[in-house]
Amino acid sequence: METSISARRRETYYLSILVLLNLLIKIIPAAILELGNDEVYYWTYALFPDWSHFDHPPMVGLLIQLFTFNLHLHGEFFIRLGALILSSASIFILFYLVKRVYSSRAAWFAVIMFISSFYFNIISGLFMLPDTPQVFFVVLALYFLLPSVTSPNPGRKEISNFILFGFFTGLAFLSKYHSLFLWAGAGLYILIKNRIWLKKPGFYLSIIVTLILMIPVFYWNYKNNFISFTFHENRVGLFHSHINPVSFSQFNFGEMFYQNPVLFVLFIIATIRILIKKKPDINQADILLLITGIPLIVIFTLFSLFHTTLPHWTGPAFICFIIITAEYLANMYNLKRKAVIRILSLALILFVAVLVTGTLQIETGFISIGKNQKYDHTGKNDFTLDMYGWKQAREGFEDYLSREGISKGSLKNTVIISDNWFPAAHIDYYIAYPLGIRLIALGNIERIHKYYWIDRRRGLKKTDRIFYITDSRNFHSPDQFRSCFSSIIPADTIVINRNKKPVKYIYIYKMNDFSCDSIPNSPHVFF
């Protein structure tokens, strides 16, 4: 007994060391990298909380509010703190899940693969995205689903676990809609392999718990003509366009890269090994994981044939394949110990290399990305510039205001306008909000997203001093608004330097004598 307790303590100690090391490695980029397009946009969810939002449920905004103490703590590190904490917690939960279902050795392999995955450890584990809480709640949901629904004779404990599965699936839904793939997997498994659950009241209670947690999203959408669902339907609808081999290729290669190419190959091998087994030899947990993970990947792969589909949309499903592959590697370890160690070491090395190289690239631009562009499109093809130069832009704008003799006390009557949610959110977070300036995004709702609701809160007056700001990466001429102003004057150009070289430009325009009651191509009527 003492030996067993000692072994568990030692196991927990080493696991804690691994999690801490992983956390320390990620703290540096979390603190020094400026926010990406999506991250800075989700900051607006915390700034203007609601039951739900145009493009996603509310959980990511709530998470930002929680870890910034309702935005009282400022800076990139605190925006991302929730991602660092939840991803670390997910590692612990995953370890004990896999240990309970398979073995301690499989659990170690699972957490090493989780840490080596670019999606789980960077995209959702470093950056603050809706995937961040989604992954955490999906891991928790699986923690309670796997040992309960596979039981041939579920008792009180299994039923309680299944209800908790419904609870955490509901929270995952409040992060991203397609988290309901968990219920699809659980339901299919019950219908095919374990119909005794259909006689258990706990099964239906778990469904009710999930449905209750979905109420905020449906309430908000009911008030807003179900605009979130029509928006996403237009993004992934199968019958609105022709077959697109480019989007299909981009999705599949992106999916492979996001998971780490080394791991992706392992996932395929492990899955094939399970599928070719004879039925009596297949573990029930393996069946459940395959039924849960495969459909989501197949569905989004099908979508990618017709529409641009982002590779991270299938990300949470790969938790199932990490668990399956962990068991496969644990079984292979006794026969091919060196091979297993080398493969996982390669995956870890590749992860560290990408994290370090990516951070250095964003901060220094040591790799030339994209061809030289015209002056007003400088940096257009360098995606790393989304996360660079915005602090310089604020300094440049403050310098411009100082040269113009505009005092900080008069900025409450100043407005910056933009015409797209990006770079509007960057301009808002790094320039407008710190200076007490209102940012208004003008355009149709597909372009401005949540700013449609933010604009109505902030308002725009004809007496406001108005600037239009755009950048060379996303340049849009202010001439689209010319009919509403007596004149539009180029006021200043801010040069963004990286490694002592100009890499993009921020353009400031003075918009004089605003005269429109509504804006062309915009849903707003301000007066």
What is each model feature region?
Residues 16, 81-101, 140-144:
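Transmembrane-helix motifs of polytopic, lipid-linked glycan transferases
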Residues 331-370:
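Signature aromatic-anchored transmembrane alpha helix within multi-pass, membrane-resident enzymes
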Residues 171, 182-307:
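Transmembrane-lumen/periplasm boundary regions of multi-pass, lipid-linked membrane glycan transferases
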Residues 99-105, 141-161:
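Membrane-interface transmembrane helices that cradle and orient dolichyl/undecaprenyl
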Residues 125-133:
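Short acidic/glycine- and proline-prone juxtamembrane loop motifs at membrane-interface regions
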